[in-house]
Regions:
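Active-site-proximal specificity loops/subdomain of glycosyltransferases
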Residues: 51-62, 105-161
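A short acidic, amphipathic alpha-helical/loop segment
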Residues: 80-84, 106, 178-182
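Short beta-strand-to-loop acidic/aromatic patch adjacent to the donor-nucleotide binding site
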Residues: 159-170
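Catalytic-site signature of metal-activated, phosphate-bearing donor transferases
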Residues: 9-58, 136-154, 169-310
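Ser/Thr-glycine-rich phosphate-binding loops at phosphate-binding pockets of nucleotides
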Residues: 71, 84, 88, 97-112
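Short beta-strand/loop segment that forms part of the nucleotide-sugar
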Residues: 90-101, 119-125
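Active-site beta-to-alpha loop of glycosyltransferases that engages the nucleotide-sugar donor
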Residues: 61-83, 98
Length: 310
């Protein structure tokens, strides 16, 4: 269930439907997990090198902000994404999983360019993709679980504060700098400083616009938090979610999200044909857009036409 603060403004019927959907999803999780345990004859499997222990998050940490980047076939915009973030981060932890494109080579290139900031790890177990039945059925402690994969990346960070970074996002440096300065000067320990990205899409004229169905990213998906044993990732029906007990603070728009600009949308489906991915791609393939000047929330943000040349 979402934190109570997120229910503000929601109708009673929306809350009831949300509760029912969560109950149904949890019944399905229990059923498919039970079937897998019967078949595999274990609750979960995880080799020591991939085991996540929440107590590891309480280690002494240095001042600054760590970024965690988890990657699968992100070659298209990866180098540009790293370049846009690296000056604003004190550390970037990159973990890639069984990529079939040039993602690992790009990671190594960037590590050599920024050896004082970038650490790269190859997570070898085959991670169940979000939206897959395998993801639903796996215990979050299993080395094949998307949840364990995220927590593994989190455990490799060494700075006080952590934020998620995606391989298809370009940071708006001026906007983020204000957040960075606030974090490092005020050192908030009880806040999740979340922010949004603009979901870019091409219009019929080949100009940058916004996805009509979702002009902005999910706000709670990206943000900065102080690491503790109570900040980690947990299992949800289709994907992982960030678990915390922090006050949530909105910091506005700070990045551009380029996923819908990719030529090969099938890469993100991991070859799966499920209801989750069919809905996902039908939405992204839709030609419906909001023109740049028609979306009030981005007034003052210049259209990033330089992205077209990346």
């Amino acid at each position: 269930m979402p934190p109570l603060s997120r229910l503000k403004g929601k109708s009673f019927s929306w809350i009831i439907n949300k509760v029912i959907s969560i109950i149904v999803e949890n019944i399905k999780i229990f059923y498919f997990r039970w079937r897998r345990v019967i078949h595999e004859k274990n609750i979960y499997r995880c080799r020591d090198e991939y085991h996540f222990d929440r107590s590891s998050l309480t280690k002494v940490r240095g001042a600054g902000i760590s970024g965690i980047m988890r990657l699968y076939n992100e070659e298209r915009y990866l180098e540009s994404s790293i370049e846009s973030y690296i000056e604003q981060l004190d550390e970037l932890i990159i973990v890639h999983n069984r990529c079939t494109d040039s993602t690992p080579e790009i990671c190594e290139k960037m590590r050599l360019k920024y050896p004082h900031k970038i650490k790269v790890f190859h997570y070898i177990p085959s991670v169940a993709p979000p939206g897959s039945l395998a993801h639903v059925a796996l215990d979050p402690r299993d080395e094949r679980s998307l949840v364990n994969y995220y927590n593994f990346a989190l455990s490799k960070t060494t700075k006080e504060y952590v934020m998620k970074v995606d391989g298809d996002c370009i940071l708006i440096a001026d906007a983020f700098l204000k957040i960075r300065e606030y974090i490092l000067s005020k050192k908030p320990s009880d806040e999740y400083n979340y922010f949004f990205g603009i979901n870019l899409k091409y219009n019929d004229m080949g100009e940058l616009a916004l996805r009509k169905s979702a002009p902005l990213t999910a706000g709670y998906d990206h943000g900065i938090f102080k690491v503790s044993k109570n900040t980690f990732f947990k299992h949800a029906y289709n994907y992982e979610v960030f678990s915390h007990k922090l006050k949530e603070k909105n910091n506005g728009i700070v990045f551009f999200h380029l996923k819908s600009l990719k030529e090969d949308l099938a890469v993100d489906s991991h070859g799966l044909d499920t209801e989750f991915y069919r809905g996902y791609f039908n939405d992204r393939l839709s030609q419906d857009v909001i023109e740049w000047d028609d979306f009030p929330q981005i007034r003052g943000i210049h259209r990033p036409d330089h992205i077209k040349s990346l």
